Regions:
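Mid-core helix/loop region of P-loop NTP-binding domains shared across ATPases and GTPases
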Residues: 1-6, 37, 54, 76-167
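Pocket-edge positions in alpha/beta enzyme catalytic cores
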Residues: 12-16, 73-76, 97
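Phosphate/oxyanion-binding active-site loops and adjacent basic polyanion-contact surfaces
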Residues: 16-20, 49-50, 80-81
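Conserved helix-loop functional segments at active or binding sites
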Residues: 30, 63, 94
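Walker A/P-loop nucleotide-binding motif
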Residues: 34-56
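Conserved catalytic segments around the Walker B and adjacent sensor/switch elements
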Residues: 39-41, 63-77
């Protein structure tokens, strides 16, 4: 079946990932009560279903509410703070972002999220060239869940303490 071969295809059911999806849903659940969610670190071998399971949770979240914005970023494709902040703006529907500085774009994101919540999923985090955006989100966005996906569980050990302590 052709759609199943499409990289962005999300099946109706993600077999053998129900437990992981329940854990992630538990991290997001406080956002429904206008509280900050929990953060998560997801790791495992390539091809075991991490990305598709998380995207399924985001898809269900998008169908359920407009008050929580699901944001998925592939850090292999966007690996600098500016690229990631600009991509978040695009996913949030913020316009006229060209030729704007990172700080200005981030201010827009904060302003837009002052009345809503967000789930940030950063996939392939081990491909990042810089982590300033992560500190900014962890420190300055109120109601959020941050989910980091990688193939390497050791990656988290390399994080700066100022970021690790906020996860």
């Amino acid at each position: 079946h052709e759609p199943a071969l499409d990289y962005s295809f999300i099946p109706k059911i993600v077999p053998y990932r129900e437990k992981e999806q329940r854990i992630i849903a538990g991290c997001i659940k406080p956002l429904f009560d206008s509280k900050s969610g929990k953060n998560a670190f997801v790791y495992g071998q390539p091809g075991v279903g991490k990305t598709v399971a998380l995207n399924k949770v985001l898809q269900e979240l998008e169908e359920e509410t407009d008050e929580i914005i699901p944001i998925y970023i592939n850090c292999w494709q966007r690996n600098t703070t500016y690229q990631i902040i600009a991509e978040i703006c695009e996913k949030m529907g913020l316009k006229f972002i060209q030729n704007k500085r990172t700080e200005e774009l981030f201010r827009w994101i904060k302003q837009d999220l002052s009345k809503k919540s967000a789930v940030f999923v950063f996939d392939e985090v081990d491909k990042l060239q810089e982590l300033d955006f992560l500190y900014m989100i962890l420190e300055e966005i109120g109601r959020k869940s941050v989910i980091l996906i990688t193939n390497y569980k050791e990656w988290i050990l390399e994080l700066e303490d100022r970021i690790k302590s906020r996860l």
